[in-house]
């Protein structure tokens, strides 16, 4: 019984290879037999869509039309669900830093496509985030501390 345990993965790999070869041989024989009888197989072609390359978009909205959707809030305003009216806004914790928008960013247009100037991907991450990470405990030191508690 120990021989089976010692060579389990080798036996499993050889079994997979053997079964694949047997199935391949069976398919080869069936295809050869079908072609000897004179049957031709046609390659299936995709259905034509009247020459239109249109994308269809579906929204997961029940009983509403696009005209009934509310307008988006201004960019600088906080999300209305985040703060209750009686609460004062909190200061961000030490882990977060402010993000400053780059106003004089050069935009390179490719083949006539342009991006809007007030797009969300034109922000700059300040260099102060690097010093915050160096003040924290490295992952391997925290991991050692966790294992010692068990």
UniProtKB/Swiss-Prot annotation:
A lipid is attached at residues 29, 31 (S-palmitoyl cysteine). Induction: Induced in bone marrow-derived macrophages by CSF2 and particulate beta-glucan. It is found in: Cell membrane; Cytoplasmic vesicle, Phagosome; Cell projection, Ruffle; Cell projection, Filopodium. GO terms for biological process: cellular response to molecule of fungal origin; positive regulation of cytokine production involved in immune response; positive regulation of dendritic cell cytokine production; positive regulation of ERK1 and ERK2 cascade; positive regulation of interleukin-12 production; positive regulation of interleukin-6 production; positive regulation of lipopolysaccharide-mediated signaling pathway; positive regulation of stress-activated MAPK cascade. Expressed in peripheral blood leukocytes (PBLs) (at protein level). Expressed in dendritic cells, splenocytes and B cells (at protein level). Strongly expressed in the spleen and lymph nodes and weakly in other tissues of the immune system, including bone marrow, peripheral blood leukocytes (PBLs) and thymus. Not detected in the majority of nonimmune tissues, with the exception of lung. Expressed in antigen-presenting cells. Expressed in macrophages. Disruption phenotype: Mice exhibit no difference in leukocyte development and subset representation in lymphoid organs. No effect on B cell mediated activation of antigen-specific T cells and MHCII glycoprotein downstream signaling in B cells. In dendritic cells, mutants show decreased cytokine production beyond 24 hours after stimulation of CLEC7A signaling. The lineage of its organism: Eukaryota, Metazoa, Chordata, Craniata, Vertebrata. Lipid tetraspanin-associated transmembrane adapter/mediator that acts as a scaffold for Src-family kinases and other signaling proteins in immune cells. It is involved in major histocompatibility complex class II (MHC-II) signaling transduction in B cells, where it is required in generating the calcium response and enhancing ERK activity upon MHC-II stimulation. In dendritic cells, it is involved in sustaining CLEC7A/DECTIN1 signaling after CLEC7A activation by fungal beta-glucans. Pfam families: SCIMP. The gene is Scimp. Keywords: Cell membrane, Cell projection, Cytoplasmic vesicle, Lipoprotein, Membrane, Palmitate, Phosphoprotein, Transmembrane, Transmembrane helix. Signal peptide: none annotated. Residues 93-150 are annotated as: Interaction with TLR4. Changing residue 98 to A: No effect on interaction with TLR4. Changing residue 120 to F: Inhibits interaction with BLNK. No effect on interactions with TLR4, GRB2 and CSK. Residues 70-75 are annotated as: Proline-rich region necessary for constitutive interaction with LYN. The modification Phosphoserine is found at residues 65, 77. The modification Phosphotyrosine is found at residues 58, 96, 120. Residues 63-94, 110-136 are annotated as: Disordered. Interacts with CD37, CD53 and CD81. Interacts (via proline-rich region) with LYN (via SH3 domain). Interacts with CSK (via SH2 domain); this interaction is dependent on phosphorylation of Tyr-96. Interacts with BLNK (via SH2 domain); this interaction is dependent on phosphorylation of Tyr-120. Interacts with GRB2 (via SH2 domain); this interaction may be dependent on phosphorylation of Tyr-58. Interacts with TLR4; this interaction occurs upon lipopolysaccharide activation of TLR4 and is enhanced by phosphorylation of Tyr-96 by LYN. It is a single-pass membrane protein; Lipid-anchor. One of its GO terms (molecular function) is molecular adaptor activity. The chain crosses the membrane at residues 8-28. PANTHER family: BCL2 INTERACTING MEDIATOR OF CELL DEATH, SLP ADAPTER AND CSK-INTERACTING MEMBRANE PROTEIN. This is SLP adapter and CSK-interacting membrane protein. Phosphorylated by the Src-family protein tyrosine kinases LYN and SRC. Phosphorylation occurs on tyrosine residues upon MHC-II stimulation. Phosphorylation also occurs on tyrosine residues after activation of CLEC7A/DECTIN1 by particulate beta-glucan. Lipopolysaccharide (LPS) induces phosphorylation of Tyr-58, Tyr-96 and Tyr-120 differentially to allow temporal recruitment of effector proteins GRB2, CSK and BLNK. Phosphorylation of Tyr-58 is immediately induced by LPS stimulation and allows GRB2 to bind. One of its GO terms (cellular component) is receptor complex.
């Amino acid at each position: 019984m120990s021989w089976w345990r010692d060579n389990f993965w080798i036996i499993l790999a050889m079994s997979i290879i053997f079964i694949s070869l047997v199935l391949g041989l069976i398919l080869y024989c069936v295809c050869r037999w079908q072609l000897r009888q004179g049957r031709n197989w046609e390659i299936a072609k995709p259905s034509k869509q009247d020459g239109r390359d249109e994308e269809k978009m579906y929204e997961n909205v029940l009983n509403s039309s696009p005209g009934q959707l509310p307008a988006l809030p201004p960019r600088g305003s906080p999300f209305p669900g985040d703060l209750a009216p009686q609460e004062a806004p909190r200061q961000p914790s030490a882990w977060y830093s402010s993000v400053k928008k780059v106003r004089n960013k050069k935009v390179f247009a490719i083949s006539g496509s342009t991006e809007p100037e007030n797009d969300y991907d034109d922000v700059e991450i300040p260099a102060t985030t690097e010093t915050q990470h160096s003040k924290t405990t490295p992952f391997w030191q925290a991991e050692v501390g966790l294992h010692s508690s068990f």
